[in-house]
Swiss-Prot record:
Chain's gene name: ftsK
Organism placement in taxonomy: Bacteria, Pseudomonadati, Pseudomonadota, Gammaproteobacteria, Lysobacterales
Organism of origin: Xylella fastidiosa (strain Temecula1 / ATCC 700964)
Localization (cell): Cell inner membrane
CDD domains per UniProt: TrwB_TraG_TraD_VirD4
Presence of keyword rRNA processing: no
Protein name according to UniProt: DNA translocase FtsK
Membrane topology: Multi-pass membrane protein
Intervals, Cytoplasmic compartment: 199-784
């Protein structure tokens, strides 16, 4: 029979549990609060009764000092008359302070120590009682010294008289005052816990804060008076101007209606609360527009009256230079306002263009851009910046119908035009884009807006990206999204390898499209999709099976678009040199039909960076603010970018035209980018393509890719020269499994490369040939 363990011998038997301790403490706290409430209910009436008895005290009432049967006038009755008489005879006028002192001390004692942690810092009840008694003694003594009267009850009472007489006999009047004052301060500290030094410090801070406050008030008053004088002066000028305008002929200024960005169906769906969380009707790969910040209400630009005044001022400024013009229209936008002027006969456009800086100085604005030709009109445009510039949010562009109705998966939301309408562009029609501008002009923000535009339009099955970021700051935030072909490239040697892989991929796609009989990537994907829907998928015409592995032809898969982002093209040109320029030129010349597109950005728009070879193959360009007309001509082949305002203000040169369009780029915050990136990371795992950044690159059939992107030979990449051969050999000998899928999974490489590694091991005698069931035996001993 098992021996029963006594309660004392059990571990922690004598220790209360945490739950029990909490229960006991909570019970005690509840009892303490209940007791405090009861004491407060009892003390409050007593103090009120005592105060009322003191205020209604009468000498004629019978009490301690006077007996009789007269009528009691005290509101507290006989007891109140007795108590008031005793207190006045004993303490004098200090009797009025006694209920107040008792009330203050009681309140501090009851409500000053709710938390147990503060219990040790509060005074004990005995000390509080000593403080109250000391307060009565000190107060009665002070009252007796300074309010001495023949009637004892009118001064400090009997107590004050006895205290002062005793102290004066030994210390005199001066010493008695000091002693009584010291006793008063100590008593107040004991009774209430008040720190006199802390009180003096607070008073000092208040006193020191008074002079700055007075100075600030005086300064505000002066500013208000100055503003009032300015308002009165403006009123006088306005009256004079109104009289002058009344004498002139009225001018017509055509103001277009305020553009309204119509929301797309996708934007309306994203604003609705889904029935099931995590469900996206357009596919879980596309992020929701709710991840972006909503546009905020902003102050508009010029008012109608200001536009009329500016129109008159423009005409007067041109008259100063002996040029007659007439303002016939004004078109306010979110950032600038375009005034359309009609010059007089015989006035050349070059005369007006040469006066852009003089007009800007005369109008007191930062810059003025002259639009020499406006299609469809015989007027000249004069673009003047608004006083209040509106911020354009990317969410407003992506919610527009212009962006949503664009059928292309490569739709870029660039910003808004001068009229406030969304401007979108199709990268597939460009087919490549060159972005240039000085530091701080908004170039990097625009690149981020382009990236997000693509991410909100196409999933990782339809679009893959290769990002090259020499500065390691702008594009590295997109690390880990499923759209990337490889990790964000920061090493320029790896950048050259990535571009070389893209050239080889372009050549491979052209071979596929030629074998299938289509002219572009859209036709190829359509033909593959139609074949799959018909139940007869197309086989890969470039597939070369290995007879030893018993491989079968693979069906063709849909090919995604590839967009290559290079954030700082000039740095890469300086490090790598001509080799990169040749690779980019090859991609720019031929990659359009293969679905590979380039977006190049640089902050150094010089001729040694933006070479003639690159400009000839990239006709679509965006120029942000630059420092000189020479830089503007380097980018756009014409001036104008030097007059931009910065912060996203750009000139967009569409493909097939020589007339740049002014666009105000959208702002993208870092928080928005991080939210979208986190959503994409959670929606799908990273799917890097093997070998994109390798120094030795091979195609699926084992052909080595040369420095120019062309295949060189068919002898490399499948034997011991593979850089991953030693690692694969170690995995096989350690795990004792010669499985292609195991090597593929452990090394994160493609199936064909893993199969070539296993085949190389078979040639070297590490593994046996495949048996009838496909298994291989590991012949080499395990590593020691």
């Amino acid at each position: 029979m098992a021996k029963q363990v006594p309660e004392r011998s059990k571990p922690n038997a004598g220790k209360p549990s945490i739950r029990k301790v909490w229960s006991v403490n909570g019970h005690r706290l509840k009892q303490h609060k209940l007791l405090r409430d009861l004491v407060l209910i009892m003390i409050a009436p007593v103090l009120v009764y005592l105060m009322a008895s003191l205020f209604t005290y009468s000498k004629d009432d019978p009490g301690w000092s006077q007996s009789g049967s007269a009528i009691v006038h005290n509101i507290g009755g006989k007891a109140g008359a007795w108590i008031a008489d005793v207190l006045f005879q004993l303490c004098g006028f200090v009797a009025f302070l006694l209920p107040v002192a008792l009330g203050v001390v009681s309140w501090i004692a009851l409500f000053g120590s709710d938390q147990e942690e503060q219990a040790e810092g509060h005074l004990e009840p005995a000390l509080r009682l000593v403080g109250i008694v000391g307060f009565l003694i000190a107060a009665t003594g002070l009252f007796h010294l300074h309010l001495f009267q023949s009637d004892v009850a009118r001064a400090g009472g009997i107590l004050g008289k006895q205290v002062c007489n005793s102290l004066q006999a030994g210390f005199g009047v001066f010493g008695t005052n000091l002693f009584v004052l010291m006793l008063l301060l100590i008593s107040v500290t004991l009774a209430t816990g008040l720190s006199w030094f802390a009180l003096m410090e607070r008073i000092g801070r208040v006193v020191l804060a008074v002079p700055p406050l007075l100075q600030k008030s005086k300064r505000r008053a002066d500013e208000w008076q100055h503003a009032r004088a300015l308002r009165e002066e403006r009123e006088e000028v306005r009256k004079i101007d109104a009289v002058q305008r009344a004498k002139r002929d009225p001018m017509k200024i055509e103001l277009p209606p305020e553009p309204i960005v119509e929301k797309s169906e996708r934007a309306k769906r994203d604003t609705q609360i889904p029935m099931f969380l995590g469900v996206n009707k357009r596919g879980s790969d596309l992020p929701s527009l709710a991840l972006l910040d909503n546009p905020k209400p902003q102050i508009k630009g010029y008012s109608d009256e200001t536009l009329e005044a500016l129109s008159r001022q423009i005409e007067l400024k041109f008259k100063d230079f002996r040029i007659d013009v007439q303002v016939v229209g004004a078109y306010p936008g979110p950032v600038i306002t375009r005034f359309e002027i009609e010059p007089a006969r015989g006035v050349k456009v070059s005369q007006i263009s040469a006066l852009d800086k003089d007009i800007a100085r005369g109008l007191s604005v930062k810059s003025v851009r002259v639009v020499e030709v406006i299609p469809g009109k015989s007027v000249i445009g004069l673009e003047i910046p608004n006083v209040n510039r509106e911020m354009i949010f990317l969410s407003e562009l992506l919610r527009s119908k212009e962006y949503d109705k664009s059928p292309s998966s490569l739709t870029l939301a660039l910003g808004k035009n001068i009229a406030g309408r969304p401007t979108v562009a199709d990268l597939a029609r460009m087919p490549h884009l060159l972005v240039a501008g000085t530091t701080g002009s908004g170039k990097s923000v625009a690149v981020n807006a382009m990236v997000l535009s693509l991410l909100f339009k196409a999933s990782h099955n339809d679009l893959r990206m290769l990002m090259i970021d020499p500065k390691m700051l702008e594009l590295s935030v997109y690390q880990g999204i499923p759209h990337l072909l490889a990790p964000v490239v920061t090493d320029m040697k790896e950048a050259a390898n990535g571009l070389r892989w893209c050239v080889a991929e372009m050549e491979r796609r052209y071979k596929l499209m030629s074998a299938v009989g289509v002219r572009n990537l859209a036709g190829f994907n359509k033909k593959v999709k139609d074949a799959e829907e018909a139940g007869q998928p197309l086989m890969d015409p470039l597939f070369k099976p290995n007879p030893d592995l018993s491989e079968v032809p693979r069906p063709l898969q849909k090919l995604p678009f590839i967009v290559i982002f290079i954030d700082e093209f000039a740095d890469m040109m300086m490090i790598v040199g001509k080799k990169v320029e040749e690779l980019i030129a090859r991609l720019a010349q031929k990659a359009r039909a293969a679905g590979i597109h380039l977006i190049l950005a640089t902050q150094r728009p010089s001729v040694d960076v933006i070479t003639g070879l690159i400009k000839a193959n990239i006709p679509t360009r965006i120029a942000f603010q630059v420092s000189s007309k020479i830089d503007s001509r380097t980018i756009l082949d014409q001036s104008g970018a030097e007059t931009l305002l910065g912060h996203g203000d750009m000139l967009y040169l569409p493909p097939g035209t020589a007339m740049p369009e002014r666009v105000h780029g959208a702002f993208v915050s870092d928080d928005e980018v991080h939210r979208v990136v986190e959503y994409l990371k959670a929606s799908a795992p990273v799917q890097y393509v093997d070998g994109v950044l390798d120094e030795i690159q091979t195609m699926d059939d084992g052909v080595v890719i040369g420095p120019a992107g062309f295949p060189e030979s068919a002898s490399g990449g499948g034997d011991e020269t593979d850089p991953l051969y030693d690692e694969a050999l170690r995995i096989v000998t350690e795990t004792r499994r010669a499985s292609i899928s195991s090597v593929q999974r452990r090394l994160r490489i493609g199936y064909n490369r893993a199969a070539r590694l296993i085949e190389a091991m078979e040639t070297a005698g590490v593994v046996s040939p495949p048996e009838h069931n496909g298994d291989r035996a590991v012949l080499a001993p395990p590593p020691r």
